[in-house]
Regions:
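Conserved nucleotide-binding/hydrolysis micro-motifs of P-loop NTPases
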Residues: 7, 102-103, 117, 206-208, ...
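Mg2+/Mn2+-dependent nuclease catalytic core
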Residues: 207-227
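Arginine/glycine-rich "motif VI" loop of SF2 helicases in the C-terminal RecA-like domain
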Residues: 223-238
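Domain-level recognition of nuclease-like catalytic cores that cleave nucleotide substrates
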Residues: 236-270
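Accessory nucleic acid-recognition modules appended to NTPase machines
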Residues: 8-9, 13-15, 19-187
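Conserved catalytic cores of phosphodiester-cleaving nucleases, focusing on short active-site segments
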Residues: 157, 185-208, 221, 242
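Short conserved micro-motifs at the rims of enzyme active sites and ligand-binding pockets
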Residues: 122-124, 201-203, 213, 254-257
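Non-catalytic terminal regions with compositionally biased, polar/charged low complexity
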Residues: 3-5
Length: 270
């Protein structure tokens, strides 16, 4: 999740060195990552400054920003040039655009997807972090790990749907709304399975071991189901299933019945 499996960066990993040694060499050695970050964008775009400004803004908001939010934050006026910047970043795979459904409206959100940029901007520019070990010992590490695992899942939708035995599906989406009682609900990923006539709520959880489904998780799942069932994006004739997508599986607990399907890291790379 540090480099996203890009062959260029993978080739720089030495098999005779530990993970920590490799990360230290690539990211924390002699300003190498800083120069690499500049070179990546300079190599892709002739006017790289504006692209880097967009990336630096998006890294502040993991779930992304709308076009109007970006323009306001960057103090720019809308127009063809800015649209071209966003389109070029999407075409290169550095960002993605997705539809966020909420209430009765939907909006296009732009989200940073480049693993190298996410790690570099989060840790390498901060003097507090001088090595991979210092990163791993920090609280922001777990936030970053959870976020990038979610991106990893989004990049492997065919494998996710195969693991869930979904034959046909329409465009997956994120959703936010409320239960009939007014409780807020934010769902990371909904997969509308057309052939199965069902909506799959995917709860994406990073864990360094088997995930332990806690009572608050079970409460969240119940709220998510209730909110989605009462939303305009859900068809009343469709069922709602919950899939836990996590790294190494889950432990048995009294809340296990809240999960219909389990997808692990192995499924993403099988």
């Amino acid at each position: 999740m540090i480099i996203g499996g890009v062959p260029y960066y993978m080739d720089r990993f030495r098999p005779d060195r530990t993970m920590a040694d490799n990360v230290n060499t690539i990211y924390f050695g002699k300003d190498r990552a800083r120069q690499e970050f500049k070179d990546v964008y300079a190599g892709l775009y002739s006017t790289s400054d504006v692209y880097i400004k967009v990336i630096r803004q998006l890294v502040k908001y993991f779930y992304g920003m709308s076009r109007s939010q970006l323009l306001k934050a960057l103090e720019k006026e809308g127009g063809g040039n800015f649209s071209e910047v966003l389109e070029n970043l999407i075409d290169s795979g550095i960002i993605r655009s997705y539809t966020l459904y909420g209430g009765k409206r939907k909006q296009t959100i732009y989200q940073l997807m480049d693993f190298f940029s996410l790690f570099y901007l989060r840790f390498c520019e901060n003097p507090e972090y001088t090595s991979w070990r210092s990163v791993q010992r920090s609280r922001p590490f777990y936030t970053w790990a959870g976020n990038t695992f979610e991106l990893l899942v989004l990049e492997h939708m065919p494998q996710i749907t195969d693991a869930l035995r979904i034959k046909e599906y329409s465009t997956p989406f994120s959703w936010s709304g409320e239960t009939p009682g007014g409780e807020g609900a934010q769902i990371d990923l909904v997969i509308p399975a057309t052939a199965e006539r069902a909506d799959y709520i995917c709860e994406i959880k990073f864990s360094e071991g088997k995930y332990v489904l806690k009572e608050e998780d079970a409460d969240d799942i119940t709220r998510h189901i209730e909110a989605l069932r009462n939303s305009s994006v859900h068809k009343p004739t469709h069922s709602v299933y919950v899939a836990l997508v996590t790294t190494f599986g889950m432990t048995e607990s009294k809340h296990r019945s809240h999960i219909n399907d389990l997808v692990t890291l192995d499924s993403l790379f099988s």
